[in-house]
Amino acid sequence: MTSRTRHCARLGIVLLGICCIASGIYLFRNWIDMFTRMRGQEMALSPNSRSFEGWKVSPLPLDFDIYLFNWTNPDDFYVGSNKKPHFEQLGPYRFREKPDKVDIEWHNHNASVSFHKKSWFYFDAAGSNGSLWDKVTTVNSVAHSAARRAAVDWFARTGVNIANKLYRQGVTITKTVDEMLFKGYEHPFISVGKLLRPQDVPYKRIGYHYPRNGSSEFDGDINMFTGADDIAKMGQIHTWNNLTHTGAFEGTCGQVHGSMGEFFPPNLGTKDTVYMYMPKMCRAIPLDYVETVTVHGVTAYKFSGTRHAVDNGTLYPDTRCYCVGGKCMPSGVINIGPCSFNASVYMSFPHFYMADPSYLEAIEGLRPEREKHEFFMALEPNAGVPMDVGGGFQANYYMEPIPGITLYENVPTVMIPMMWCEERVRVSEEIAADIALVPLIVLLGQIVTGILLAGGLICTCWYPTRQVTHFCHSDPKAKASVLRPLNAFGVNSSAATAPVAQLFRNNISSSGNERVGVRLLDYNRDSGIRLESGTMESSHRERLISEDSPDVVVR
């Protein structure tokens, strides 16, 4: 191989190293974004995408557990009884939910899809603790709501007092679990209300989940982004019932945003907050990162509802807009009256978990526990896919005395717990295995980036270093052959030999003024190489380099 060929090969190695370093730096800065774009093209929701069927009809079994609070001492509910309302929890009453998306319409102009959610609920007797025929006593919310509306007018108050006696209304009502939940029950005040003001009473019956079973209107019309133009927007709500602001709460509290629960933004971090939109609350619930967990071997970030999620300005100023009509309750409950025909209904975490202690102090029978009552979502951070979801919310009724209404003039002010629901879904091991590929691909990209950077550094730095090392350890004749031709190009050979002479000088001067024995190489044009040995005084050393000779003499 000629010297020119060797030179070109060496130059090629260095250039290859530079290219590897540049590629490694580019991947280091852009790999996550590149992978997100590639995955977005594959995962964006469309009629032909892989995610469509799983989104339309969930492939996972969905357990919907309902717990009811049975009021055991309603006869002692009056001012001066010195007895707190006592409740016992009944359930769970488990239902298997079969959800479906219907009335699907695609909107390519803004990469969104509109749909209605339709769910069927089937009672699971084997998984339940009780039957649908169990009796439960709870607050008569319809009668109290009618009394609240009539409180400002004397004629209305008189009419409500007469109706309460005529229809034998009490502070509480007792029904079967089936009637309380999906079947519903008839109430005389609802029948009268439909005759007087039908626009305010859209239903014939009342029940906690009536008429949710088999209804496509219960959650309203939902429009969400598909992620076709931006994968980070996939699954995020755009409008609810054609609204971007519900009007239920002022300012940002009434904005429509967040996820419906199927998709969340990718590339999540521990500082992020995710939002889940709750149609029946007319608001989004913030979930904050709490810990890193493992689900079927896949690392996931657990986001949970904190005190911030159920505050109304008591603890966090930014949540003050959840106060309705200037009335702010102690932290821990959410007023959903604007979403529930202005009923005095409040939502909280089960058993008033993370709520102000005053709610628990006013009643008996409830005991909040994080393991049982936490609302959480474990999300795979790279893809934003839910791995494990659990928890729910509790419905409460705010009971207060109403002057002029005989039935409610002497009742204490108490937040009455009625029921709470828990949805639990966890991905199967097969689905988890597919999801596990996402972090592996991300890791693979990082490994390739490291290999490119390391290989580039080796090619760029190792070869020149090897050449210098080889030169320093070569024999004197080889060094002379390298240095001598420099004169032909007008280069002062003394400058070229200076590093070698400096090396000799350093080796000698390291002994101070002591007499040292050294073996010196004297380069000579005629003889080629001459070895001189001697002993000399280091303080009298001097290097002489002839202008017409590359000989180095040390004396």
Swiss-Prot record:
Cytoplasmic side: 1-7, 456-555
InterPro entries noted in UniProt: CD36_fam
Membrane protein topology class: Multi-pass membrane protein
Main location: membrane
Disulfide bridge partners, by residue number: none
Glycosylation sites: 70, 110, 129, 213, 242, 312, 342
Extracellular side: 29-434
Entry's localization field: Cell membrane
Disruption phenotype: (Microbial infection) RNAi-mediated knockdown blocks infection by M.fortuitum and uptake of M.smegmatis.
One family name in Pfam for this protein: CD36
Similarity comment: family membership: Belongs to the CD36 family.
Function of the molecule: (Microbial infection) Plays a role in mycobacterial infection. Mediates infection by M.fortuitum and uptake of M.smegmatis.
Miscellaneous comment text of the record: The name 'peste' means plague in Latin and derives from its role in bacterial infection.
Protein name in UniProt: Protein peste
Organism of provenance: Drosophila melanogaster
Lineage: Eukaryota, Metazoa, Ecdysozoa, Arthropoda, Hexapoda
